[in-house]
């Protein structure tokens, strides 16, 4: 596995919601690992001429789960989250919905209300990624979230050598700018916000049977920088844009 710093630029913002009822769920500011795996699977498949998102009984994203071990994120500023946004047809002709049994017109809107939208105009997101995929796959990322969440990859740098170290429980780490799991820290000093996101779940890639129990995990997101004390042994990554911590087995 190698560690990369991937710099992404969003064109206008992004929406990262829960499949399958994605239009009526809130958006996440920090992408869950399942979203990252899906984005990289799509990038790799497109680069290799495989343009199939879903095949009955199989998922391309599921095959990439073992290739991504860890991901952490740094935001230039906190995106503005909107809880609802009306979706409407932009075609020439309005589509009208009818109740067939009653024979009555329901609405002239063809789509559901969309909940969850992060306004992040031309915003930069740095992604620290531990993976065995090629650098070309990382440069091929075009979206991170829903189909509207278009990104451009500005740069991909490999982090090596002395920039990756193991730190012991009780260590004081300064200049932390990347998101981290609450379980890794004993205390945090600085400005941050907490995002509760779904833990990795292979069942999300089964498009015909949804998971009944979804575990979540609290993620601390520095806004813009914090210092912390580790609650257990951890792995420290030093980058040009600040420090990141992760589980000790990454070292």
Language-model features: locations:
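N-terminal ordered "arm"
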Residues: 2-54
């Amino acid at each position: 596995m190698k560690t990369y710093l991937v710099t992404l630029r969003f064109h206008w913002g992004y929406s990262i919601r829960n499949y399958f009822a994605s239009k009526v769920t809130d958006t996440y500011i920090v992408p869950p690992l399942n979203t990252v795996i899906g984005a990289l699977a799509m990038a790799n498949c497109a680069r290799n001429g495989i343009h199939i998102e879903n095949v009955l009984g199989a998922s391309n994203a599921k095959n990439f789960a073992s290739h991504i071990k860890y991901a952490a994120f740094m935001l230039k500023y906190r995106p503005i989250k909107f809880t609802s946004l009306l979706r409407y047809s932009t075609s020439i002709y309005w589509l009208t919905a009818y109740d067939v049994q009653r024979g009555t017109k329901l609405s002239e809107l063809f789509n559901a209300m969309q909940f969850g939208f992060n306004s992040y105009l031309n915003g930069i997101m740095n992604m620290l990624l531990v993976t065995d995929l090629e650098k070309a796959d990382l440069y091929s990322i075009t979206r991170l979230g829903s189909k509207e969440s278009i990104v451009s990859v500005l740069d991909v740098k490999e982090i090596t050598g002395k920039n990756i170290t193991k730190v012991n429980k009780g260590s004081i780490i300064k200049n932390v700018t990347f998101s981290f799991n609450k379980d890794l820290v004993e205390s945090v000093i600085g400005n941050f916000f907490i995002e509760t996101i779904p833990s990795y779940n292979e069942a999300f890639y089964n498009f015909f049977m949804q998971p009944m129990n979804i575990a979540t995990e609290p993620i601390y997101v520095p806004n813009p920088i914090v210092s912390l004390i580790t609650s257990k042994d951890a792995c420290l990554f030093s980058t040009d844009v600040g420090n990141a911590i992760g589980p000790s087995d990454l070292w």
